[in-house]
């Protein structure tokens, strides 16, 4: 060893004597050392499956660093699990390196070290550090969105809307993605590879006359949701039915590079574009109005995607001009400005603010910035809730093209005009009036209905002129070459188009109030001006069109549209908690809470028999009596009602987080029972229509996914819901006669409009829903014209409606048709003598709560003796049980079933039922004795032999907390679990407990109802 050291020392001395050129020699003989560990190491959990690690380069590495290796392993894991490593190449330009380690287990602690490596090999490991990934609960993706709603716009376009799912997961939703499938051709879903920021869109470029289904996914920072429930299958129109007319403003687009193809399940060679819809903040509850913004995307080349360049907001001078000869700024009733925004430059040089778009104005020259549908104000920044659209001469609203109308159509329009000229309606083969079209215009205060089947125009002019500022109704009808115009139900005017062609091709949208190309339509329609005024209603081919913006209504787009009813409630004075709402363009009603009525809710009243009116938007609400789990698999409703209209909702409830619902509706005079367990809707419809103005009884029941409907004495209708789910959960109230918001109802519920008529009885699972006590909210519910409203029952008696008649339920001590007789005119202290033998009428009862009585009908032994007579086969003689009754609750009962006497009891481990067969409803007096000793029971009737029985299980005591009832009880079916449906019809003369405890039936009773005096002993 000393020899080696000496040699090395000599070599070093030699190298130093050789000068700088010997440095390489010194390096060659130096022994290389390990690279030190990286510095400033930082760890952090990113989500439930990844963490980040950051470090800096080691100081004074002995040799150049080539890269790094991250070593990580689970803390406390099985030693058989190998340590994992992750290599990171060196980035020379960045002193600090950061890396993400993924594909980890949620909520798991990891031990992490890092080492640099060089030509000399692996460097020294850093000290181990620990990091724990986030728990699974904090990294949840969103729930699947609700089933999308699809409207077919044309032969190549559809409009989609959807609502978010029950949960957005552990992070806000970032965007949505849309997928589609053609069921007749495709086996896989095709993804539209674009991030949709809104909850509505329009897809273009689809195949004509083809079936499609659509689904939606939501994405947050933790991943995508499951695919939504697919939409219903829709079919695009045939080219002959409708075209793909442009119905939205044009936008500047820029062809840019798209994102990569990840996420595509199938790529078809389709050229599909879509239009994303922008929400308007004024709409609450997730239902959003929109404007259409064009984008294009070629699915055959997903990397090439059209991107929208949003309009630039700028402070530009606005020219306000007068109608003659210059246009001016106009305002709606609420003062929201509908600006002309006219500029003396073409659209190529004009910048419009957000929520507006530019059109060239050929009438005045220059260009105009128009607000999109649902926006107004000087910069189009104010929200306008549109229900009754208001037009200003350059406005318009678009709807889908006329469908199934090429041979015949009928259109009804109610409007109020403020100018002598203007275009009301237009739909045609193209935007410029060449070829096929139909139009309705006001020309010098006359209405002109024009249509062209391709070979000549028909012009039909109203015989009378309209009155400016007044409301008018016009009906247009065409069948082939022949047309008809009727104004205000006056004498129809007819006309005929020229030539032989009798069909019209409609490709453009249906324009209301004007058109974007109105200037070029003058030769076809007779005017180049837009309509000025309000439209209150529009119906096409018998179907009323909801003029609100899609997806709430059917309006697809529009420009510079106001709201006619705006400000109408500013001067309204609804009191007692009432709220104002517009019901027409120029009128309002107060939505009065329960117990108040009148134009301004000024009249207080007591609700007895509810009357609902569609015109007043009536409804009432009551909570479910029990928790939702009590109704998951079975529910039954009995309703007695009198309809004044053949359409409307009787009852509705639903679940906000799923597809579950149930509804009872009138549709075309028939009763419909609809329900959905979450996998498909069942629809049961009565065979015969109802007679309006008459009282009817209906019963609906659902067991799992099977339903039953019976109306009056009609044939019972049975049906089944689709799919495999069998339970319904409803977390909303039960809505009766209407609902607060018809936009929130389930799509297949059939709930379209309020009920008009009266409802006098609602029973749910044998439990009566009382109007006075159970209705918790509602609006504009008044009293029906019924005798019970006048409170005809005296002395505290309650009126029980029986269709158009009634019965009085009299308190103990009173009798008569109206409870007007007091103990048969005896004094109060002689009630006992007057009603020594009480008579029961099937809805009577006597109640006892004296502890000396109750202890004899409980415990280990019971002995009951009773003398009775009856003419009814069924009826309850005696009952004591828990209140409320639960499964396997203790009870003891005595009664008649189909003429036989039945003694039943349950000690908590099963029911004993001991029967004596016979016909004891013969109107004669009978003696019955029922004895229980522990589990054993015996019943004896008259001189018949005794019948015995024994309850199952081990329980021997009768433990009851309820009162004792004789002859019947309140809500008998509910409280006896349907063992008995009515009380005794007859008399009871003797009642003895424990062989020697005689009870005075009336004197000892604490309460009773409908007790009369029995005629003979």
From Swiss-Prot:
GO MF entries: calcium ion binding; glycosaminoglycan binding
Matches recorded under Pfam families: EGF, EGF_Pikachurin, fn3, Laminin_G_1, Laminin_G_2
Entry-linked SUPFAM superfamilies: Concanavalin A-like lectins/glucanases, Fibronectin type III
Main location: secreted
GO cellular component terms listed in the entry, alphabetical order: basement membrane; cell projection; interstitial matrix; photoreceptor ribbon synapse; presynaptic active zone; synaptic cleft
Record text on subunit structure and interactions: Interacts with DAG1 alpha-dystroglycan. Interacts with GPR158 and GPR179; transsynaptic interaction is required for synaptic organization of photoreceptor cells.
Sequence ranges assigned to domain Laminin G-like in this UniProt record: 386-564, 609-788, 835-1014
Annotated keywords: Cell projection, Disulfide bond, EGF-like domain, Extracellular matrix, Glycoprotein, Heparan sulfate, Proteoglycan, Repeat, Secreted, Signal, Synapse
Protein name, per record: Pikachurin
Gene: EGFLAM
Function: Involved in both the retinal photoreceptor ribbon synapse formation and physiological functions of visual perception. Plays a key role in the synaptic organization of photoreceptors by mediating transsynaptic interaction between alpha-dystroglycan and GPR179 on the postsynaptic membrane. Necessary for proper bipolar dendritic tip apposition to the photoreceptor ribbon synapse. Promotes matrix assembly and cell adhesiveness.
PTM per Swiss-Prot/TrEMBL: O-glycosylated; contains chondroitin sulfate and heparan sulfate.
Signal peptide: 1-24
UniProt GO BP: extracellular matrix organization; positive regulation of cell-substrate adhesion
Domain Fibronectin type-III positions: 37-136, 144-239
TM segment ranges: none
Glycosylation, residue list: 47
Phylogenetic classification of the source organism: Eukaryota, Metazoa, Chordata, Craniata, Vertebrata
Biological source species: Homo sapiens (Human)
Subcellular location as annotated: Secreted, Extracellular space, Extracellular matrix; Synaptic cleft; Presynaptic active zone
